[in-house]
Amino acid sequence: MILKGFVFVAEGVDMSQLDIVKRSSLHSIHVELNASMIEESRWERPNWYINPDTEMAQITATVGICDISPVGKLLVEGDKLDGFCNKIGYKSSVKWGDVVPHSLSEGKMVLCRLSANQLLVVTSAENIDPVTNAITPELTGCLHLTDLTSLYTGILVCGPQSRGLLETLTNIDLRESIFPNMSCVQGRVADVHCTVIRNDRKSMTAYEIYVTRDFGQYLWTGMSERGSDLGLLPFGVEVLGRLIS
């Protein structure tokens, strides 16, 4: 069973002809910061704020934050998740707290084992539909999938000072020995329940933080204020691409 949000349109309207551009819960903040906006995968996103080179330099030196809300967030819940992973081509079990990369012909993804009965599948915005279609046939028994993409805000915190910044906002143990690269956990950041995924970029410590949409601005603002002494800057899609390539 797949649970998704719905957009209601008039009867007879061809949905394929609708040009719907989505915005994250942080859109008004990006506008206030005079971000240069672009459309990517039907999302309006900040391409850059000051300029990409300055933003990249700041991340390399200290820390930066980026709105990654458009990434696909597919939550699979139920028993026998190990069997589900096997059916979609991942032959080992994904242990609680582990994050593992996986690929299908439909697209790349990471599998994040949040609990015994919860697996978060994270993929790129353009691969949400093909990945969903590929894994849906394997939702047997009591397994079901919920598309959280538009319901959750995503914030990437990246740079050598990212751990230090987050440690001022959470009691999650982020020490390297406890929470190494490719780990995930659910806990509280700025006193808000979040999912935290450690997924480093270009050898720089990086955390993906996902929170329900209604707390997105609160979390972004809290991080920005707490990181001001570190020279924290927001960065956009241009720099995000450099961190991936």
Predicted segments, located by residue:
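Basic, glycine/lysine-rich polyanion-binding surfaces/domains
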Residues: 2-245
